[in-house]
Design a protein with these regions (language model features):
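N-terminal leader segment of winged-helix/HTH proteins
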Residues: 1-50
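C-terminal regulatory/oligomerization modules of transcriptional regulators
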Residues: 1-18, 141-168
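Charged, amphipathic alpha-helical coiled-coil/dimerization segments
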Residues: 8-11, 89-148
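Amphipathic, non-membrane alpha-helical segments in soluble helical-bundle scaffolds
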Residues: 19-30, 81, 121, 143-146
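Generic structural concept
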Residues: 30-33, 60, 64-67, 114, ...
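Alpha-helical linker/hinge and terminal dimerization helices associated
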Residues: 32, 36-39, 43, 77, ...
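N-terminal helix-turn-helix DNA-binding core of bacterial DNA-binding proteins
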Residues: 38-83
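DNA-binding alpha-helical recognition surfaces that contact promoter or target DNA
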Residues: 86
Length: 168
């Protein structure tokens, strides 16, 4: 049934195969996100880190060696959840993140990892390095596959951001 079209809610014609592939991509992105959280959770559990959620661990990973404000973490795409303040407060209470006033703007709070946060980040980085080393021999995913996937996912991310920004 190639070439069949369907009319969307604004009267535009959408090729059925494009719609089907787009829906498949949506489902896959959602499943991959959940699977990543499960993989991180499994690694946390093995290391005895039952005090953290996978979202909090990824937030630690993304903070890295830099100092950030909560707003910067969100605006740069490192954290897209609505409860960034809750998670940062929790990480602060657990001793993974410390905060201090910005040198340039005393109203702004800057966040950085503590030694415990840096140790956890190294653990996560080791896991990601292990994944990267086995991606080809075990997963059958080569570097050019990742380059192509990353280009497509970046375009999709930009497309969705534009949907919100320009109310398309």
């Amino acid at each position: 049934m190639a070439g069949q079209t369907q009319q969307n809610s604004v009267g535009e014609l959408v090729e059925e195969s494009s719609l089907s592939e787009y829906r498949r991509a949506l489902s896959l992105v959602e499943r991959l996100h959940r699977q990543l959280l499960d993989v991180v959770k499994d690694d946390l559990d093995r290391a005895g880190h039952d005090d953290l959620t996978p979202v909090q661990a990824l937030l630690i990973f993304n903070i890295g060696d830099a100092e950030w404000s909560a707003g910067e973490l969100k605006s740069r795409g490192f954290y897209l959840g609505s409860n960034v303040s809750y998670n940062l407060k929790k990480l602060h209470e657990l001793g993974y993140v410390e905060s201090g006033k910005s040198l340039h703007d005393k109203r702004q709070i800057r966040l950085r990892l503590t030694q415990a946060g840096s140790d956890l980040r190294r653990q996560l980085d080791t896991m990601f390095q292990r994944h990267a080393a086995t991606l080809s021999p075990v997963g059958g995913v080569e570097s050019p596959d990742l380059v192509s996937s990353n280009k497509t996912l970046t375009r999709l991310e930009r497309f969705w951001a534009d949907q919100i920004r320009f109310r398309l």
